[in-house]
Amino acid sequence: MKNEISIKFNFPEGILGFEEIKEFIIKDSEHKPFSIMQSINGEINFLVTSPFNFLEKYLPNIEEEDWLDIQTENEDEKVILCIINMHVKNYKEITANLKAPIILNKKKLIGKQAISTNEEHYLRYRVFKE
């Protein structure tokens, strides 16, 4: 069994649709550059990745209040992930939710799902371009 890195994050507000779940583990996936975000009880799993892996110029407009909610004090503490939709027949149809990114404070291990006010960001952004 290889060494798997997993980090537990507290989500005080839960995430959209799963507000009652407050703790998630983010762990490596064997399918890079993706990671798995799993509820502590193991019932809910999301595939996540950095949006910068497929969209270099991703500029989410995240409210300062959202960053304060997870107690970030500087840019080095901030991490942005997006949830991946794999429920497709063809890998070219895999999409990422750029509209509601997961924001993390990697120092204090606090997370939140925020809403990007950037009108160019969609709930279903195609990860693999033709």
From Swiss-Prot:
Interacts with translational regulator CsrA and flagellin(s). This is Flagellar assembly factor FliW. It is found in: Cytoplasm. One of its GO terms (cellular component) is cytoplasm. SUPFAM superfamilies: BH3618-like. The keyword Cytoplasm applies. The keyword Cell membrane does not apply. GO terms for biological process: bacterial-type flagellum assembly; regulation of translation. InterPro entries: Flagellar_assembly_factor_FliW, Flagellar_assmbl_FliW_dom_sf. Belongs to the FliW family. Keywords: Bacterial flagellum biogenesis, Chaperone, Cytoplasm, Translation regulation. Acts as an anti-CsrA protein, binds CsrA and prevents it from repressing translation of its target genes, one of which is flagellin. Binds to flagellin and participates in the assembly of the flagellum. It holds the Pfam family FliW. It comes from Borrelia turicatae (strain 91E135).
